[in-house]
Every structure is written in structure tokens, then in C-alpha cells.
Curated annotation (Swiss-Prot):
GO BP term, example: ribosomal small subunit assembly
Function text: Protein S19 forms a complex with S13 that binds strongly to the 16S ribosomal RNA.
Protein name: Small ribosomal subunit protein uS19
Cellular component GO terms, alphabetical: cytoplasm; small ribosomal subunit
Family: Belongs to the universal ribosomal protein uS19 family.
Keywords recorded for this protein, A-Z: Ribonucleoprotein, Ribosomal protein, RNA-binding, rRNA-binding
Species of the source: Flavobacterium johnsoniae (strain ATCC 17061 / DSM 2064 / JCM 8514 / BCRC 14874 / CCUG 350202 / NBRC 14942 / NCIMB 11054 / UW101) (Cytophaga johnsonae)
Molecular function via GO: rRNA binding; structural constituent of ribosome
Spans annotated as Disordered: 72-92
Lineage start: Bacteria, Pseudomonadati, Bacteroidota, Flavobacteriia, Flavobacteriales
TM segment ranges: none
Gene: rpsS
């Protein structure tokens, strides 16, 4: 289910505060966050946000196309290494 429109988008208050400080000062420093559930708002465009994926921080440069999505969508948590194959598949 989608979030109710009357509630508005969720953005962690500390993340929002850090991004606003970057915008006001004109800096483009990387902001680290563990809040993967925070929604990307138009204020975030042009900022680089390092999103934690459980092991490390993945830098995400926010563009206009990302507005309305969640930060966690751009920081994959699983790495697919391929299915196990037969070792000597070609030999008979």
C-alpha cells in the first residue's frame, strides 16, 4: 500500500536538516545516512547522499528523475554472483 497523501512524505529530520545546511551554505559535501526509508524531495536534487546498505555507504548523486523515490532504492543490499554452473560442462 502507498503512504496516505494526508501524511506527506517521510524524511528523517536529521537528514533534512543536513541537506538544508548544504543548500544554504552552497556546499556540496557528502551527507551520510542510514535512513533508507526517507523519500527524495526536490530539495535533495544536486546533492550527494551516502546511503548505508548494511555493509558500507554507497554514494548516490540525486537527480530530478529520482524525486519521489526512496533512498534505499539506489543502494543495493544484495550482490548477485551468478548461479552455480557445472565445472566441466563442455566435456563429454
Amino acid at each position: 500500500m502507498a503512504r496516505s497523501l494526508k501524511k506527506g512524505p517521510f524524511v528523517h529530520y536529521k537528514l533534512d536538516k543536513k541537506v538544508q545546511e548544504n543548500v544554504e551554505s552552497g556546499k556540496n559535501s557528502v551527507v551520510k545516512t542510514w535512513s533508507r526509508a526517507s523519500m527524495i524531495t526536490p530539495d535533495f536534487v544536486g546533492q550527494t547522499i551516502a546511503v548505508h546498505n548494511g555493509r558500507q555507504f554507497v554514494p548516490v548523486y540525486v537527480t530530478e528523475n529520482m524525486v519521489g523515490h526512496k533512498l534505499g532504492e539506489f543502494s543495493p543490499t544484495r550482490s548477485f554472483r551468478g548461479h552455480a554452473g557445472a565445472k566441466n560442462k563442455g566435456k563429454k
